[in-house]
């Protein structure tokens, strides 16, 4: 029996948190397929947002498991992982989007063409990855939250980053569907999902990509 590949789930430690629904779907789909490791900046615990009746019990049960304690993103060696997954994280634009540690890991994944998957507001985390003042995902096609989706938030005027604008301004190719529609883009080894609703489709593509390697 072959050993399972290892997947790193990177989550935000910012106060805006991590989508409970997206993280639950990521974890439940990946757990049978991968050995999982979670990581956050500073190894801080994950602050779940949008917890409701369907996710509340799962979050409670998850929080007492050993793997609920994230590793420090700063100490992660990207070479140890075969896949990288960033769920929908409203907090990503506050910390992951500027993380030198995540940039280092993403540079390794690009150099080795290893699968990377980012969903919804987690796509903002990809903005951290620059080399020689150039974004390493320029010339990639991708999606992420559209302005039409983001503008519905009361925090829109205070957002430090608009993913759609960043991608277009830094040489990427951006597409989106209508608000809240399932929309996933696969370009080479990069998978992006537009929103929380796209989580399952994006992660299933990550699993397929890993199975084909």
From Swiss-Prot:
UniProtKB keywords: Endosome, Secreted, Signal
Residue runs in coiled coils: none
Entry's localization field: Secreted; Early endosome
Matching SUPFAM superfamilies: Class I glutamine amidotransferase-like (SSF52317)
InterPro entries: Class_I_gatase-like (IPR029062), Prot/Nucl_acid_deglycase (IPR050325)
Gene3D superfamilies in UniProt: 3.40.50.880
GO cellular component term, pick one: extracellular region
Record carries keyword Signal: yes
GO biological process terms on file: methylglyoxal catabolic process to D-lactate via S-lactoyl-glutathione
GO molecular function ontology, one term from the record: glyoxalase III activity
Complex formation: Homotetramer. Component of the FERRY complex.
Protein name: Glutamine amidotransferase-like class 1 domain-containing protein 1
Gene: gatd1
